[in-house]
């Protein structure tokens, strides 16, 4: 996947800007506060209809603008060209168009223009709450598996309905036929989601090990494990077996859920555990090891999506060089400039002397 042209109006700090990137690595440099991250956000919006930061659409509005509009020309690795337009205003909401055709559902774009983003905030993947790691799981699988995304969205809707019913029934000591219906639906969706997540983690482990191996200066073995309350046979289990266990678990927790008015079990409460050399990353790793793990997670995510889709994602790396020493920075550039990598965008506060990198000043982009 390649971005040929990006036009920006009323987005963040950019009132009007046009960006014409190159193939391979694009390094965007400039002082802090000049809109470098905003540019990466705009690219992410055109690929996935949202920012890679936890912000709302209204937050992305330029302070002098009543709406923002992004237009991107993208080309797949098979040379199919697409034009994506994202429009947002507080009055009209968000609208997304692909080749002038409006999207009925924003989820339809997921996986069409694969994109991976890495920012300093991603340290939350290893140091933050389980929600951050579930979000990573869902983003990785959803871009490569539309059935998973459909089940995930359905699960969230059913979970909300079940939680509402549980809240209404709070402190009762008996169930109801309506709750049983929602529980059966949630159990089936939960089994599908957990089944795919576990298989993803097993496959992804090799991509993570490969990402570590790409850095010659690192001599560590990473690991990850899916954490759920279910008792699973590590060698073999079926989706049907998962569904049976989940139904039994809900039956076991029924009275606790009625007492608390909340769904207490399911993939929305699961987690990922990370390790280095078989030791817990959270408990034993240094800050530098955490940063390295996050970078390798994102590289692994990039190459995982690339292989499953047979399409190289666009890679957005915000201020990544501040997290790396000079040797690992050079190793990262070598990885990103290899034939198996595609187009990438790296922001930094100063110009870097890498032969493989096309340099852009943020001021030059803003002036269009």
Curated annotation (Swiss-Prot):
What SUPFAM superfamilies does the record point to?
P-loop containing nucleoside triphosphate hydrolases (SSF52540)
GO terms for biological process?
A: DNA replication; DNA synthesis involved in DNA repair; double-strand break repair; SOS response
**Where does this protein reside within or beyond the cell?**
Cytoplasm
Q: Which residues bind ATP?
A: 30-37
Single GO molecular-function term? ATP binding
Q: Could you tell me the superkingdom of the organism this chain comes from?
A: Bacteria
Indicate where this protein is primarily found: cytoplasm
Keyword terms: ATP-binding, Cytoplasm, DNA damage, DNA repair, DNA replication, DNA-binding, Nucleotide-binding, SOS response
Membrane-crossing ranges are none
Its Gene Ontology cellular component terms are: cytoplasm
Query: One Pfam family this chain carries?
Result: SMC_N
- What is this protein's function per UniProt? The RecF protein is involved in DNA metabolism; it is required for DNA replication and normal SOS inducibility. RecF binds preferentially to single-stranded, linear DNA. It also seems to bind ATP.
| Family according to the record | Belongs to the RecF family.
User: Any idea what this protein is called?
Assistant: DNA replication and repair protein RecF
Task: Name its species.
Answer: Chloroherpeton thalassium (strain ATCC 35110 / GB-78)
Gene (UniProt): recF
């Amino acid at each position: 996947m390649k971005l040929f042209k990006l036009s920006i109006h009323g987005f963040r700090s950019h009132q009007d800007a046009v960006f014409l990137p190159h193939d391979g690595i694009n390094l965007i440099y400039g002082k802090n506060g000049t809109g470098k991250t905003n540019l990466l956000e705009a690219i992410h919006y055109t690929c996935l209809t949202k920012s890679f930061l936890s912000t709302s659409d209204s937050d992305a509005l330029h302070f002098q603008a009543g709406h923002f509009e992004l237009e991107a020309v993208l080309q797949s690795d098979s040379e199919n060209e697409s034009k994506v337009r994202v429009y947002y205003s507080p009055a009209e909401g968000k609208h997304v168009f692909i080749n002038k055709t409006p999207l009925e559902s924003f989820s339809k774009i997921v996986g069409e223009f694969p994109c991976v983003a890495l920012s300093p905030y991603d340290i939350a993947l290893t140091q933050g709450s389980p929600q951050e790691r579930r979000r990573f799981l869902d983003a990785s699988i959803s871009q490569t598996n539309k059935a998973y995304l459909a089940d995930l969205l359905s699960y969230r809707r059913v979970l909300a309905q079940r939680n509402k019913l549980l809240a209404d029934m709070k402190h009762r000591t008996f169930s109801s036929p309506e709750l049983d219906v929602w529980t059966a639906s949630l159990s089936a969706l939960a089994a599908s989601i957990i089944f795919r997540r576990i298989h993803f983690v097993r496959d992804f482990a090799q991509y993570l090990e490969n990402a570590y191996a790409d850095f010659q200066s690192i001599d560590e073995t990473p690991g990850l494990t899916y954490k759920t309350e279910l008792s699973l046979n590590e060698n073999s289990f079926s989706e049907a077996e998962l569904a049976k266990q989940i139904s039994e678990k809900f039956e076991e927790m029924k009275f606790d859920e009625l007492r608390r008015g909340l769904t207490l079990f399911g993939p929305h409460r699961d987690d990922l555990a990370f390790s280095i050399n078989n030791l817990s990353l959270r408990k034993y790793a240094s800050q530098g090891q955490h940063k390295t793990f996050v970078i390798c997670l994102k590289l692994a995510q990039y190459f995982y999506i690339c292989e499953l889709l047979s399409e190289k994602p666009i890679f957005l790396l915000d201020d990544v060089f501040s997290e790396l020493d000079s040797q690992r920075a050079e190793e990262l550039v070598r990885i990103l400039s290899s034939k198996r990598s595609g187009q990438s965008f790296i922001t930094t506060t100063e110009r870097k002397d890498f032969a493989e990198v096309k340099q852009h000043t943020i001021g030059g982009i803003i002036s269009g």
